[in-house]
Design a protein with these regions (language model features):
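Macromolecular interaction modules
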Residues: 2-296
């Protein structure tokens, strides 16, 4: 008698034939090379359905099953976290309440182009199959090239493990370096001078910096074209505490140092906490009653 699993499929399954994107496994070290940062706003009244669609289907079918995509994680910004945003509104989110769900994916160094071509083709295939979710809007979806990292400890959390580590919070900070300032000079100040002074004794375990990359010309049309500004840098701050507990000692102090140095300005600091997979937790806490567009 044929055994079946929980989905009713034959226990003895046949392998699917290879498609146009074969994975060629090499002996390269596991190093972060690039990332996808996608900040999305579900439309009011569709937040539960959006959360379930994304975590049960799109998180995997849109990225995680792709070649050289070795880590991913989802985060959420509740209304109380959005109230911390600085400045608000910002050049990244526009209206204060936008950008409730963030997904970040790590791509293996040296394989960005292979992964990117697969990702665009895959999302187009999902569109054709009716497996996308119409009731949501992209707020900031862009690719980033890994630049550098700085850990609080001498032998601390490496970037490659950051999305798997159980961080209590995350802050995405977008900063523009001063006009005429060389990128290498700004990076050296951040990595070798500013952060070694700021991080000790704070909840900020790791900072990962990344520079914007352009989307492919044939990227899906529902993703707004965001120009890759070469003066703008994204830093991801992985926290041991809730963002509110780290805001003054980490985020505000960082902004004051960057702008006080004359080397740049912070254009957005956006706090998040991890989602809880398999639950609807936080879907009822995305917006406050006085947010623009809140249900009456």
């Amino acid at each position: 008698m044929t055994q079946t699993d929980a989905h009713g499929a034959d226990a003895e399954r046949k392998e699917r034939p290879p498609r146009q994107h074969p994975i060629v496994a090499g002996a390269e070290p596991i190093k972060l090379g690039s990332m996808l940062f996608t900040l999305v706003e579900p439309r009011r009244g569709h937040e539960v359905a959006y959360n379930r669609w994304y975590e049960r289907d799109h998180f995997y079918s849109g990225c995680m099953i792709g070649p050289y995509n070795f880590a991913g994680k989802r985060f959420v910004a509740t209304a109380d976290l959005k109230a911390l945003r600085d400045p608000d509104p910002s050049e990244i989110t526009g209206e204060p309440a936008r950008g409730s769900y963030l997904s970040i994916y790590w791509v293996l160094d040296g394989y960005h182009d292979v992964w990117n071509r697969w990702a665009v083709d895959q999302v187009k295939a999902l569109h054709r199959a009716g497996r996308m979710f119409e009731e949501r809007d992209h707020v900031h979806t862009l690719l980033y090239r890994y630049a550098w990292e700085r850990s609080r400890e001498a032998d601390g959390l490496p970037a490659e493990l950051a999305l798997d580590h159980p961080s209590a919070g995350l802050v995405a900070v977008f900063a523009d370096r001063a006009e005429g300032l060389d990128a290498a000079e700004f990076a050296a100040w951040m990595r070798d001078e500013h952060l070694p002074s700021l991080l000790p004794g704070t909840p900020a375990r790791l900072v990962v910096a990344a520079d914007p990359l352009p989307l492919l010309i044939d990227a899906p049309g529902d993703v707004p074209r965001t120009e890759a500004d070469d003066r703008r840098q994204l830093t991801l701050w992985f926290l041991d505490s809730a963002p509110a507990e780290a805001w003054d000692t980490v985020v505000s102090a960082h902004r004051a140092a960057v702008e006080g140095s004359g080397k740049g300005r912070v254009v957005a600091a956006l706090p998040f906490i991890p989602t809880i997979p398999g639950t609807d937790t936080y879907t009822d806490r995305l917006w406050s009653a006085d947010d623009p567009g809140a249900a009456s």
